[in-house]
């Protein structure tokens, strides 16, 4: 049984804070260690360009976010961890998807609609300050997901639309050019941890109420001391309901620790003492990671090497897959022309190659006809590049390649002529 492929994007537009850690980094790192899961994590620096026009900020954010995830335990050997802009196949796929995505679909995108509604409400031109990047943002996100045929994409409920739009793009492309993409599914956690900030509102850079994830001990203690509390004196019972301090503590503490602080609230613990308890609990978890983070942040060359290695791993899949997609849409070598006929013929459903990874870690592919019937099945390859090269040989040389690759193929499910006809159909598109 093949593994389930998860994909997570991280926009490089700010410095990670405790809310990011509790809501995304910590659960994602834990999930990446699950057996039978193939995880892709990417730094979405192309996406950041839509929000940020400060080059230094994007570069610094990329460094800080990469260092934060690595310090929190993300294993680049176990997962594929890469920078979006290091995989040129992604913007190329964006264009292919742009050509099958209706403008009406993009008109309904939440970010674009919100910008238009805001302008309309203030009497401005609906598209004032709306860039093509903002409008096309869902297509780029679709390319991120579909390039690696992710099965599951963890998102909040407010981001489900992005996955639905990626599914639409996949289905549109598959309808026109054959089955190439797996329509992704949104993975929604029943309860995503959301931390309150210093002022009690959701911890967010927008409210400037965050606690940086790897603030120094001194800064962490100072920021925690600034958490807004009520005026109840020491000895007066205090409510845990609505207490930002208690909610933050709960996100880090065990059930027993939480119960102990709840009892202390009931007994009238002083706010200063409660803040000290919170500081010590957070620092106990963060301190080991802080040391690792500082080591990484002061060695950007090490992070760069990790990201480039991750990009190379990602491109082992992306490059041969993109070659298949280019061929599918007609971006082919003229020497591969299968017919001189100039008459327009009706579009027919084509056979297709499907490449995937099994639980044993090996990469395989199969050739199916337009109805999904299995025609050809490979044995396992050590890398997706090797599998992609075999597919390319079959597409180029047809049945001749079947002889050359016979030691890497399962016994045929059908006769050789049927497979040969399918390969010729795939090569010519007719």
Question: PLM features: what roles do these ranges have?
Answer:
Residues 373-383:
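A short, exposed loop/beta-hairpin motif centered on an aromatic-Gly-Thr core
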Residues 382-399:
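A short, charged, amphipathic alpha-helix used as a generic interaction element across diverse proteins
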């Amino acid at each position: 049984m093949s593994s389930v492929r998860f994909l997570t994007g991280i926009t490089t537009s700010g410095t990670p804070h405790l809310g990011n850690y509790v809501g995304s980094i910590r659960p994602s790192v834990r999930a990446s260690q699950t057996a039978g899961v193939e995880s892709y994590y990417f730094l979405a620096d192309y996406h950041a360009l839509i929000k940020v026009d400060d080059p230094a900020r994007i570069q610094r954010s990329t460094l800080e976010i990469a260092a934060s995830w690595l310090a929190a335990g993300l294993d680049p050997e176990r997962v594929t961890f890469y920078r979006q802009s290091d995989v040129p196949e992604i913007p190329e796929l964006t264009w292919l998807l742009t050509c099958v995505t209706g403008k009406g679909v993009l008109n309904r995108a939440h970010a674009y609609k919100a910008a238009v509604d805001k302008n309309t409400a203030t009497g401005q031109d609906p598209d004032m300050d709306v860039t093509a990047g903002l409008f096309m943002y869902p297509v780029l996100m679709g390319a991120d997901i579909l390039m690696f045929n992710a099965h599951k994409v963890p998102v909040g409920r407010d981001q489900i639309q992005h996955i639905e739009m990626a599914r639409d793009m996949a289905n549109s492309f598959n309808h026109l050019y054959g089955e190439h993409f797996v329509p992704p599914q949104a993975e929604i956690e029943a309860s995503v941890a959301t931390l309150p900030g210093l002022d009690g509102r959701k911890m967010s850079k927008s409210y400037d109420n965050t606690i940086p994830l790897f603030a120094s001990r001194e800064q962490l203690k100072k920021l925690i001391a600034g958490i807004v509390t009520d005026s109840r004196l020491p000895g007066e019972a205090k409510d845990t309901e609505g207490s930002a301090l208690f909610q933050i503590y709960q996100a880090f503490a065990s059930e027993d620790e939480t119960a102990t602080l709840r009892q202390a609230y009931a007994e009238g613990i002083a706010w200063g003492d409660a803040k000290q308890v919170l500081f010590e609990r957070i620092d106990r978890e963060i301190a080991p990671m802080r040391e690792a983070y500082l080591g990484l942040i002061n060695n950007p060359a090490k992070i760069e090497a990790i990201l480039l290695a991750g990009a190379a791993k990602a491109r082992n899949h992306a490059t041969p897959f993109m070659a298949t997609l280019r061929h599918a849409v007609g971006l082919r070598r003229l020497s591969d022309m299968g017919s001189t006929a100039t008459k327009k013929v009706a579009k027919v459903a084509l056979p297709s190659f499907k490449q995937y990874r099994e639980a044993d870690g090996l990469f395989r592919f199969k050739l199916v006809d337009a109805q999904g019937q299995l025609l050809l099945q490979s044995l396992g390859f050590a890398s997706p590049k090797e599998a992609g090269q075999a597919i390319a040989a079959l597409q180029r040389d047809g049945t001749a390649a079947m002889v050359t690759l016979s030691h890497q193929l399962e016994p045929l499910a059908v006769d050789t002529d049927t497979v040969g006809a399918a390969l010729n159909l795939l090569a010519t598109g007719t």
